[in-house]
Amino acid sequence: MVMGVVVAVVVVIIGIRTSHGSRADAPDCAVVKCVALTFDDGPGPYTDRLLEILKANDARSTFFMIGNKVAANPAGAKRVADAGMEIGSHTWEHPNMVAIPADDVAAQFAKANDAIVAATGRTPTLYRPAGGLSNDLVRQTAAHYGLAEILWDVIPFDWYNDANTAATRYMLMTQIKPGSVVLFHDTYSSTVDLVYQFIPVLKANGYHLVTVSELLGHRTPGSSYGSRENGPPANQLHDIPAEEIPSLPHTPSPKPMPNFPITDIPGANSGGPNNGA
């Protein structure tokens, strides 16, 4: 009887761990082509539509959420988690983490973790610093909270090219390779539109869309990663015929949400509401 209980507990623990960032049937990214699309600064007004697009394409992604936005919209964060996506921390207020006092660095991690756990029941294991700005102190503090640092190797500047998605698309076409971690923001309707039309290109090129944890495996807390370095050979993406690119549906504009990412710590703003990460 005791053995049965132990086995049951182990199964439950493994199930929780698997559902957190990776699937039991996740592809082997050392063998097949994988890419991790990541989305910063949510949850926001376009997150739900993005979630439906990902689910319809059997795609998994990692969402680096700002803690105070999660606290303001816990139901939105839970919907992302319940859909099988991975949620990482983007700190509590999106400050420049290298410009704030050590105590504030710890608070940024602690408060964001608490908000994510309260909303989703899951403790994040990954974080992304605002603007990619980090140092040894930030990473050491992150380690205390069980967090590994995830950066990127493809940054298509979707916030800068909000009105010029052709430029964003060109960067994706020329930069993505097996093992890439792509930085997007789900706070822009243009980004969601682009993802909707670009996923068919990735799938036509044989890519599996996975979470960061599925791409990289377990990462040591306090360590830093930008992409996966071992995998299939890199080949440039081939475009698909225009008629195979799905037309954008008419979607009503969602109600605006307050923009939280600017920190209230004096002199510690990372560069604006959406400064690139």
Task: Describe the function of each predicted region.
Residues 1-15:
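Hydrophobic membrane-insertion alpha-helices, especially the h-region
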Residues 35-39, 61-65, 86-91, 125-129, ...:
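Structural recognition of the beta-strand scaffold that forms the well-ordered cores
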Residues 50, 138, 198:
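Aromatic/hydrophobic pocket-lining residues that form π-stacking "cages" and hydrophobic walls in ligand
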Residues 26-29, 57, 70-71, 190-267, ...:
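C-terminal domain-boundary segment and adjacent tail
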Residues 42, 66-68, 92, 130-132, ...:
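Active-site beta-loop-alpha junctions enriched in small/polar residues
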Residues 93-123, 131-178, 191-194:
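Alpha-helical scaffold elements lining the catalytic groove of polysaccharide deacetylases
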Residues 77-79, 103-105, 165-167, 224-228:
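Short low-complexity, flexible loop/linker segments enriched in glycine and/or proline
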Residues 20-120, 201, 217:
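Active-site beta->alpha N-cap acidic-glycine motif
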